[in-house]
C-alpha cells in the first residue's frame, strides 16, 4: 500500500498546500505495469504490478485539497521477498517525492515573482513502523494506549463486516500519522492478503 499525506489548503491558495494527488499520481505512474517490478525465476516471469484501489480522504466535494490519498498495488512474486518489494517501493516513493518537489519548486519560482513566499517541503518517506515509532517517541504511553484502543475498534469493525481490511489499514495509518507533525509524508507497506509465490 501507499499512503500520501498532504498539506490542507484552499484551491485558490494551492501553492500554500501540498496536494497528495500530485505525489500519488507520480508514484502510480512509476509503478503501474513497470516491468522492473515484475519478478522472474528460471524462464518464468510475473505480470508487472497494477493498482487495484485508490482514493482520497475527502468524504464530500469542496474547494480544498484533500489531506491524504491512499491506494493498493498488487505485486506478484516468484522469488522476491517482502523486503525486496518494500525496498523497491521505498526507492520509487522517494524518487517520486523528489521529482514532484523539484517540479513544484520550479513552478513556485515563477509564481513567487509575483508573491514573496518560499516553499520549504522536504522528502519524507517512511514505512508504517517509522511513523509508529515517531508517534511513540513524541507521545509515549498516551499514544500507545490510544493506539491499542484504535486497533481494538478496528478489529471489531473488521470482524463485524463494517470495515474492509483496506478501510481498517488506512484508518490505522491515518490515526498514527495524526500524531506526528503535519508535513507531506509518504507511508508505504504491505497489507493482507499476502499470497505465496505464484507458479
Show the residue positions of the predicted features.
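Substrate-recognition/cap regions that form aromatic- and gly/pro-loop-enriched pockets
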Residues: 151-199
Amino acid at each position: 500500500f501507499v499512503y500520501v499525506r498532504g498539506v490542507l489548503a484552499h484551491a485558490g491558495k494551492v501553492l500554500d498546500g501540498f496536494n497528495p494527488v500530485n505525489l500519488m499520481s507520480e508514484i502510480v505512474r512509476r509503478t503501474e505495469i513497470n516491468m522492473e517490478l515484475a519478478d522472474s525465476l528460471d524462464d518464468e516471469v510475473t505480470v508487472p504490478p497494477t493498482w487495484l484501489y485508490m482514493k482520497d480522504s475527502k468524504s464530500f466535494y469542496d474547494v480544498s485539497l484533500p489531506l491524504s490519498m491512499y491506494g493498493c498495488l498488487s505485486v506478484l512474486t516468484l522469488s522476491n521477498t517482502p523486503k525486496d518489494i518494500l525496498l523497491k517501493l521505498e526507492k520509487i516513493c522517494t524518487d517520486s517525492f523528489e521529482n514532484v518537489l523539484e517540479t513544484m519548486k520550479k513552478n513556485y519560482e515563477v509564481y513567487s515573482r509575483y508573491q514573496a513566499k518560499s516553499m520549504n517541503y522536504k522528502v519524507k518517506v517512511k514505512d508504517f513502523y517509522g511513523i509508529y515509532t515517531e508517534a511513540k517517541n513524541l507521545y509515549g504511553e498516551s499514544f500507545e494506549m490510544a493506539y491499542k484502543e484504535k486497533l481494538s475498534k478496528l478489529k471489531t469493525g473488521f470482524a463485524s463486516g463494517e470495515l474492509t481490511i483496506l478501510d481498517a489499514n488506512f484508518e490505522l495509518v491515518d490515526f498514527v500519522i495524526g500524531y506526528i507533525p503535519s508535513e507531506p509524508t509518504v507511508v508505504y507497506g504491505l497489507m493482507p492478503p499476502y499470497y505465496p509465490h505464484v507458479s
